[in-house]
Amino acid sequence: MSGELPPNINIKEPRWDQSTFIGRANHFFTVTDPRNILLTNEQLESARKIVHDYRQGIVPPGLTENELWRAKYIYDSAFHPDTGEKMILIGRMSAQVPMNMTITGCMMTFYRTTPAVLFWQWINQSFNAVVNYTNRSGDAPLTVNELGTAYVSATTGAVATALGLNALTKHVSPLIGRFVPFAAVAAANCINIPLMRQRELKVGIPVTDENGNRLGESANAAKQAITQVVVSRILMAAPGMAIPPFIMNTLEKKAFLKRFPWMSAPIQVGLVGFCLVFATPLCCALFPQKSSMSVTSLEAELQAKIQESHPELRRVYFNKGL
C-alpha cells in the first residue's frame, strides 16, 4: 500500500466518534449533504472503485486520507450498504433536504382546500414509500404487501388527520390552521414507520455485544429502535413546519405578498429548506445509530440465553435504523 495512507483506516465505520452528539452530527451533515445528488455517474463509480480497492489493500498513488473519506461518504450516499446496488436518486439521504423542502413547502402553502390536501399528502407519502423502499434492509427486504399496506395506511392517516383538523380549525385563528400539515405528517410517521418495520416487531432485530457478536433477536429492541426513529422523524419535520407559519402569517399581511401572491410558495419552500438543512442531520444525530439497552429489558427467554452464555454482560447493542 502507498506510504501516504495508513493501511488500517476503518472505512466501514463513520469518520467521527458516534458516542457523542457532535460526532454523530458531523457524520449526518456529511451523509445528508444535498450536493451529493449532483454528482455524475463517473464520480460515483470512481468513489466506488476507491472504496472497493482500499478494502482489498489497493491504493492509487497520491490518494490522501481526506480523499479516501470523501470517496467513502460519496459511496455511502449512493449505494445500498447491503446489496451494493445504486439507489434510486430521490430515495438517497442526500435527496432528503431538497425533496422535503419542496413537498413540505407546498403542503404548507396549499392546505386550505380538500383537493390540495389530498394531492400533497399523497405526494408526501409516495415519497416516503420510495425512501423506505430504497433504504430497506438487504437481509430482510420488504414485501410488496408490507410496502403497500404501510403506504395506503400512512396516506389515509395523513389525509384523515389533515381534513379532520381543517374542519376543526375553520373557526379559529388562520395561524392555527397553518399547523394542520405538521399534525398530518406527525400522524403519518406514527403509522408509516411501525407498519414499514412490522416484521421487526414480530420477529425482532439482531442484538449484539459491544464487539458486534450476535446474541439473538429481540422485539423489545425493535420497539425501542422504532420509537427513537419516529421521535427523530417528527422532530426533524418540526422546525420546517413550525417556524415558517409564523413568518408567512406576518408576510402575507404585507403589501409585497398582496401584490405578488404567487411568491408565497417559493418563499415558503425556501424557509422550509433553510430549516431542514440543519434539522435533518441534527435530528438524525439525536440517538446513536448503534443504540443499546439493558439486558434486563429484553424478553425473558433471550435474557436467560444471554445470562447463560455471557453472565457478565449488562447491555446489548442494535442498529436502530433511520
Curated annotation (Swiss-Prot):
This is Sideroflexin-1. Belongs to the sideroflexin family. Residues 121-146, 196-228, 288-322 are mitochondrial intermembrane. It comes from the Eukaryota. Residues 2-102, 168-174, 250-266 are mitochondrial matrix. Keywords: Acetylation, Amino-acid transport, Membrane, Mitochondrion, Mitochondrion inner membrane, One-carbon metabolism, Transmembrane, Transmembrane helix, Transport. NCBIfam families: mtc (TIGR00798). The modification N-acetylserine is found at S2. Highly expressed in tissues with high one-carbon metabolism activity, such as blood, liver and kidney. The chain crosses the membrane at residues 103-120, 147-167, 175-195, 229-249, 267-287. The keyword Transmembrane helix applies. GO terms for molecular function: L-alanine transmembrane transporter activity; L-serine transmembrane transporter activity; monoatomic ion transmembrane transporter activity; transmembrane transporter activity. It is found in: Mitochondrion inner membrane. It comes from Homo sapiens. One of its GO terms (cellular component) is mitochondrial inner membrane.
